[in-house]
């Protein structure tokens, strides 16, 4: 009997090819798109760039018709609002810089979507992520590994996956490059073969976080820039418009290159300093998830990434109380940012990760 798999289809080339590959491999494939966001007028996003626009549903439906697979649309707007949007806004209001894609993967795609899939009789879910899942019989655990195409690897945003999620998820694209995926799309005669990748956060198509937060919260009071001694340097926009390490768009001249070194939301202050002030060699992370084991019992050596685009750096992670770890880097890291995720690797294996609570100088 064929195993049933529900593919999360965004209307893009990756998830479309994932569905085509699984059908070719003999699975009983179903497709579904999660409608997760609408604008303040109650209308679906209409920008063609967004993975949750009305065009995304149209493109996904066209692909499903070509592949001759059943197709569903799940209304998950309320869940997305409560779980992702509110979290995103709350973190910025706290003076932190969140990664909403990680929260969406953790709570929407691999938790709620998986629950829906199991409820309608599916054996697995699948997505178009570039990552590899393998079962290690010696550990009796599923492992998450980097994709073959290192430049497309998406394991950074998947470190929160549990053993249950990994056991029920398929990543058909893990062993392909992006060019190979586009060629497969042409082979399968899919209309999205040349569709560009989405770049922005899906619910902020213009990439203007500050404008979005102001509109959602009504908080618009200007703040002040101060130096590391507390001296006022000038007027700033509301503090939530800034992130640690930022230099562009400050709109202030001090005669020196200045960077955001700290954010004080309770005082509506943005602390500026010279570049040396944004380097640190340690951090504390919380809200941890480990994949090859349940809990870190002793200090281990890893490589670590402090943001999606960062280079990995050698580090030690040391267990602390209250589900926290101390991460000690061998070299100072630029702009360690509270709210972002730090993800740990052992060669190609994802060890786990957590949310950065604070940097330690």
From Swiss-Prot:
Keywords: ATP-binding, Cytoplasm, Disulfide bond, Nucleotide-binding, RNA-binding, Transferase, tRNA processing, tRNA-binding. Residues 152-154, 307-308 are annotated as: Interaction with tRNA. The active site is at 104 (nucleophile), 202 (cysteine persulfide intermediate). It catalyses: S-sulfanyl-L-cysteinyl-[protein] + uridine(34) in tRNA + AH2 + ATP = 2-thiouridine(34) in tRNA + L-cysteinyl-[protein] + A + AMP + diphosphate + H(+). One of its GO terms (biological process) is tRNA wobble position uridine thiolation. Coiled coil: none annotated. One of its GO terms (molecular function) is tRNA binding. Pfam families: tRNA_Me_trans, tRNA_Me_trans_C, tRNA_Me_trans_M. ATP binds at residues 8-15, 34, 128. Disulfide bonds join 104-202. SUPFAM superfamilies: Adenine nucleotide alpha hydrolases-like. InterPro entries: MnmA-like (IPR004506), MnmA-like_C (IPR046885), MnmA-like_central (IPR046884), MnmA-like_central_sf (IPR023382), Rhodanese-like_dom (IPR001763), Rossmann-like_a/b/a_fold (IPR014729). One of its GO terms (cellular component) is cytoplasm. Its EC number is 2.8.1.13. It is found in: Cytoplasm. The record marks 129, 340 as: Interaction with tRNA. Belongs to the MnmA/TRMU family. NCBIfam families: PRK00143.1 (NF001138), trmU (TIGR00420). Catalyzes the 2-thiolation of uridine at the wobble position (U34) of tRNA, leading to the formation of s(2)U34. This is tRNA-specific 2-thiouridylase MnmA. The gene is mnmA.
């Amino acid at each position: 009997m064929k195993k049933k798999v529900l593919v999360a289809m965004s209307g893009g080339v990756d998830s479309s090819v994932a569905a085509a590959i699984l059908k070719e491999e003999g699975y009983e494939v179903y497709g579904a798109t999660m409608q997760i966001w609408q604008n303040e007028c109650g209308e679906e996003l209409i920008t063609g760039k967004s993975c949750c626009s009305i065009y995304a549903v149209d493109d996904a439906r066209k692909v499903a018709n070509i592949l001759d697979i059943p197709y569903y649309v799940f209304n998950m707007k309320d869940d997305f609002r409560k779980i992702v949007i509110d979290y995103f806004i709350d973190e910025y209001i706290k003076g932190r810089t969140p990664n909403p894609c990680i929260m969406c993967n953790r709570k929407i795609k691999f938790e709620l979507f998986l629950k829906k899939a199991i409820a309608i009789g599916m054996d697995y879910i699948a997505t178009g992520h570039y990552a590899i899942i393998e079962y290690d019989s010696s550990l009796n655990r599923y492992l998450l590994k980097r994709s073959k195409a290192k430049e497309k690897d998406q394991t950074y945003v998947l470190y929160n996956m549990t053993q249950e999620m990994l056991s029920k998820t398929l990543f058909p694209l893990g062993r392909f490059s992006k060019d190979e995926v586009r060629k497969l799309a042409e082979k399968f005669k899919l209309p999205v073969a040349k569709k560009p990748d989405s770049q922005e956060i899906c619910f902020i198509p213009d990439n203007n976080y500050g404008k979005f937060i102001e509109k959602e919260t009504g908080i618009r009071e200007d703040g002040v820039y101060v130096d590391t001694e507390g001296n006022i340097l000038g007027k700033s926009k509301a503090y939530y418009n800034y992130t640690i390490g930022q230099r562009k768009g400050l709109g202030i001249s001090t005669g020196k290159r200045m960077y955001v070194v700290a954010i004080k939301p309770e005082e509506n202050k943005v602390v500026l300093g010279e570049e040396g002030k944004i380097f640190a060699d340690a951090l504390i992370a919380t809200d941890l998830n480990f994949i090859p084991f349940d809990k870190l019992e002793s200090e281990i050596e890893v490589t670590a990434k402090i943001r999606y685009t960062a280079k990995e750096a050698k580090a030690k992670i040391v267990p602390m109380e209250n589900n926290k770890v101390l991460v000690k880097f061998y070299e100072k890291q630029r702009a360690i940012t509270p709210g972002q995720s730090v993800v740990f690797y052992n060669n190609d294996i994802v060890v786990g990760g957590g949310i950065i609570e604070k940097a330690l100088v």
